[in-house]
Each structure stands twice: as C-alpha cells, then as structure tokens.
Amino acid sequence: MWKLCLRLLAVLAVCLSTATQAQSDLFLLSPKRSGAPQPVARYCGEKLSNALKLVCRGNYNTMFKKASQDVSDSESEDNYWSGQSADEAAEAAAAALPPYPILARPSAGGLLTGAVFRRRTRGVFDECCRKSCSISELQTYCGRR
C-alpha cells in the first residue's frame, strides 16, 4: 500500500512541475490589453513551432512574411537554403577579388551590385530565436483568415 502511495506522490510531483512550466509558457502566449507592454521571450526549435501553431492556429504566411521584397525570389531562396544572407554572399564574392589598388575598372564596378545595398530579409528564426520577440511579432507570421 505504501508503495502505491509513493508512486502516486511521484506522479503527482511530476504532473505539478509540468503543469507549472506549461502555465508559465501559456502566460507568455495569452492575449494582452492594448497599450500594455507585452512580455518577450526567445522561441527556438520545438518551442517556436508550438508557439506559432498556437498563435496562428495553423494558418501561416509563406517563407518570408513581407509581400514585396527587394531580392528576387530565386536569389532569396538560394541564400535561405545555403544559410547565407545576401550581405554574406556579396562579401564572399568581394573576398575572391584582388586588393583595392589593383582592381581593374570592370572588376571594381562589379563590387557595386545591388546585393551590397539590399536589406537583409529576416525571418521568424532571426526575430524570435536569435533575439526575443513578443506575441504580436509572432502574429505577423500568421496568414490572413
């Protein structure tokens, strides 16, 4: 009998610790009054996907949240899948050229491509895992209903 009580007590302790953790996560995802500061948190991995699932209710935007982009779709997808931003790709191309005083005019002009001046496209990982984000920022990745 005492073994059963001990097991029941252990199960109860695990359930309570799990419930308090889930409750603290739900606090971050609860709707807030307008004007009140929203808590921010870092969401990475499974926590990010679960937060998006809860906030967006299964309705998501495409890979990039902005409808119009400075970078062409094929170029941005190549950079996305290679793990390289447009800035990093431009820096790698510039590193392959000889040093400044020796550059020929055509090579020097090639350094001034649009990729140097493009703004880096940021995704949900950049905004919510690399740095903290709020629920309203997470909602910007939800699709229209």
From Swiss-Prot:
Cell compartment(s), UniProt: Secreted
Quaternary organization: Heterodimer of a B chain and an A chain linked by two disulfide bonds.
SUPFAM superfamilies tied to this protein: Insulin-like
Keywords linked to the UniProt accession: Cleavage on pair of basic residues, Disulfide bond, Hormone, Secreted, Signal
Entry protein name: LIRP
UniProt lineage: Eukaryota, Metazoa, Ecdysozoa, Arthropoda, Hexapoda
CC per GO annotation: extracellular region
Residues spanning the signal sequence: 1-19
Disulfide bonds: 44-129, 56-142, 128-133
Similarity section: Belongs to the insulin family.
Propiece residues: 20-33, 117-122
Keyword Secreted: yes
UniProt GO MF annotations: hormone activity
